[in-house]
């Protein structure tokens, strides 16, 4: 994948949660392949694209997310964002008292309900210093914020994160596979480019990612397939773009990996 324009993190401190406004919203349009540089902050974040798919990278995982999903990033986690296509990005920042339970201390992908999508769009995306609010506007905003929290607590978590290793050799291999999801090379072929033997890489997959090469690749393909499904691509075209000779072979992979056929798995993409 060609590299795009690298962008700063767009002054997140100007949207920092406060006791008066513990939930903040930010809006930004990213061009195709634009990168938001790695950064971190002291508050939790929800990354959600209104249109277009994004890839969110942390040191431990990568998430490929279409508009019907969002990525939860706990406080203090270094992360970067890449626009897989032009996207209208929304970011929510959460004060420490919001969603502070144990389940919210790990990054994950969440399903976005139609109601949550509309609530995010309704939140004012104003940086500091924000203009004064009328009592009616403040009451409306607080009501929307309460509903956002309720919908997030109801949101279904999805196992769509793709774990990334610390070992430099395995990291090179994983990053290369992320760039070429439709390339159906075996571990022997990928090993030649990674600078390690297939046996070493197989061991590293188990030790660092707790999975096999084949299982990790299936998870990667699912993440890419979900993005294609969100664009309305037919199953046969998704299978072809991901390097499968037939839709039935792709269906078998999805069913084997998630326990259901793609028609069910992607029905809300």
Where are each of the predicted segments found?
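…primarily DNA-binding HTH/wHTH and HhH modules…
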Residues: 1-2, 252-269
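Generic protein-terminus/edge-of-domain signal
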Residues: 1-53
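Short acidic-glycine-tyrosine-enriched beta hairpin
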Residues: 60-75
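Short hydrophobic/aromatic patch on the recognition helix
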Residues: 68, 201, 205, 249-250, ...
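Short, Lys/Arg-enriched, Trp-marked, Pro/Gly-tolerant hinge/linker segments that flank
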Residues: 106, 130-194, 207-219
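Terminal helix-turn-helix DNA-binding modules in bacterial transcription factors
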Residues: 188, 207-251, 267-269
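Alpha-helical residues within the helix-turn-helix
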Residues: 192, 203, 207, 240-241, ...
């Amino acid at each position: 994948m060609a590299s795009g324009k690298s962008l700063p993190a767009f002054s997140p401190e100007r949207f920092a949660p406060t006791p008066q406004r513990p939930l903040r919203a930010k809006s930004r349009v990213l061009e195709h392949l634009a990168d938001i540089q790695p950064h971190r902050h002291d508050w939790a974040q929800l990354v959600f694209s209104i249109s277009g798919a994004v890839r969110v990278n942390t040191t431990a995982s990568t998430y490929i997310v279409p508009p019907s999903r969002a990525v939860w990033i706990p406080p203090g986690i270094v992360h970067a964002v890449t626009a897989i296509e032009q996207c209208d990005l929304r970011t929510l920042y959460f004060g420490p008292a919001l969603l502070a339970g144990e389940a919210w201390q790990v990054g994950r992908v969440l399903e976005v309900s139609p109601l949550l999508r509309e609530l995010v769009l309704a939140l004012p995306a104003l940086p500091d210093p924000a203009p004064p609010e009328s009592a009616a506007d403040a009451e409306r905003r607080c009501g929307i914020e309460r509903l956002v929290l309720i919908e997030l607590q109801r949101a279904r978590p999805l196992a769509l994160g793709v774990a990334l290793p610390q070992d430099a050799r395995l990291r090179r291999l994983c990053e290369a596979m992320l760039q070429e999801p439709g390339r159906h090379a075996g571990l022997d072929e990928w090993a030649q480019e990674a600078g390690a033997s297939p046996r070493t890489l197989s061991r590293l997959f188990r030790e660092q990612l707790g999975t096999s090469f084949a299982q990790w690749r299936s998870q990667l393909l699912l993440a890419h397939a979900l993005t294609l499904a969100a664009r309305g691509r037919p199953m046969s075209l998704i299978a072809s773009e991901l390097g499968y000779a037939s839709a039935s072979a792709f269906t078998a992979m999805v069913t084997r990996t998630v326990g259901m056929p793609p028609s069910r798995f992607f029905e809300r993409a």
